[in-house]
Amino acid sequence: MAKVDVVERVTEIIAEVGAPLGIELVDLEYKREGRDMVVRVFLEKREGGINLDDCADVSRQLSDILDVEDFMPERYTLEVSSPGICRPLKKVADYERFLGHLIKVKTFEMLADEAGNKRKTFTGKLTGIADGVIGIDLTEGQKARVPLDKVAKANLEFEF
């Protein structure tokens, strides 16, 4: 099974296993580390937050299904955890949910903020998302608008 197919199937399984528990997939990594592949699953639970027991439940169920379906093309390690406090922002719904929070965005290419300063990293308060563009009030005082298709990586930042 191709890498894309593995990711799609694991995503489907997590949705099936997690939905009854109120658990959602935040991110999924399937990549080579050393000689083996790693399936790294990041989960969240909107009501009450994700805990160790939730992760263990999903891990056991996912592992059992992966063993039965046996579609993984090579040896792998399964890791299931919360996304942590610097949670990635992957979907439009993530940006909508975390309006007003401090975020860090890295782009594929240099982009200008409203003052004309070019950069690839934007840190500030998420002020909005519309028409595929996120608005950020930068920590330096400027504003920026970053198209989602230019975002290489985005995550929440811890506020002290």
From Swiss-Prot:
GO terms for biological process: ribosomal small subunit assembly; translation. InterPro entries: Ribosome_maturation_RimP (IPR003728), RimP_C (IPR028998), RimP_C_sf (IPR036847), RimP_N (IPR028989), RimP_N_sf (IPR035956). SUPFAM superfamilies: YhbC-like, C-terminal domain, YhbC-like, N-terminal domain. It is found in: Cytoplasm. Pfam families: DUF150_C, RimP_N. It comes from the Bacteria. GO terms for cellular component: cytosol. Keywords: Cytoplasm, Ribosome biogenesis. PANTHER family: RIBOSOME MATURATION FACTOR RIMP. Belongs to the RimP family. HAMAP family: RimP. Required for maturation of 30S ribosomal subunits. This is Ribosome maturation factor RimP. It comes from Citrifermentans bemidjiense (strain ATCC BAA-1014 / DSM 16622 / JCM 12645 / Bem). The gene is rimP.
